[in-house]
Amino acid sequence: MPASASTRTIRILGPLALCAALAGLTGTAHAVPEAQFQSAFQQFLQASGGNSNAIEQAAEAFSGLSNRATTNPVVLAYAGAATAMRATTTMLPWKKMGYAEDGLAQLDKALTLLTPAHDAAVHNGTPGVLEVKFVAANTFLAVPGFMHRQERGAKLLGEVLNSALLAGAPLGFKGSVWLKAANEATKAGNPAEAKRYLDLIVQQKAPQAAQAQALLKGAST
């Protein structure tokens, strides 16, 4: 994954807005110091980018943060995603299943914690509801089919794509969502839909534009 804040798959924090409307949310948001969140997030990015050594660190970091901020769905979603990734670090079948199931359970809980207050940013410039759903969608779509999460993952991705909140999200986050949608469309054998999302990335000059252009070029050859 790209290392800069503007090019990350999942964007990092901007200032909280609408403070008066978020009186019930600020307690959970402040429960995790931003510096600690960013440190854990950097480890998560490395893990997501293929650094297997960072998976354990990311899982431990976000699990620790979620234990302190038990009602923060964004932190819990990252904890769940990182825990699920730990399934790739062991050859033991029962450990693989344990990590995957524990991570999915955390993601399920994070989704249940979402309220209208999370339409605003929690730890990102992206609305918390979109971030949690996108993290969950990525994980659900990545786990093996026998875990029966693909349908829900596709549904969550669709909810993010169709949300009115997406228009106001950071361009980097939107680009990540469109790129994921394009990849899923390609997997589903729908090249026209994939091209539509890739074209959108390029037209909007999202940070993922170079990657989208490469995919478009590959599809045309």
Give residue ranges: language-model regions.
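Short coil/turn linking the two alpha-helices of tandem helical-hairpin repeats
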Residues: F44-G49, M85-W94, H118, T139-M147, ...
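Bacterial N-terminal signal peptides
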Residues: L13-G24
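Helix-turn-helix repeat elements of alpha-solenoid scaffolds
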Residues: A47-S63, K96-P116, M147-E159
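Terminal, low-structured helical/coil segments at or just beyond the last alpha-helical repeat
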Residues: L171-T221
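Start-of-helix signal in alpha-solenoid helical-repeat scaffolds, especially tetratricopeptide repeats
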Residues: P33-F37, I55, P73, A77-G80, ...
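Flexible helix-coil transition and linker loops at the boundaries of alpha-helical arrays
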Residues: S63-V75, D108-V129, N162-G172
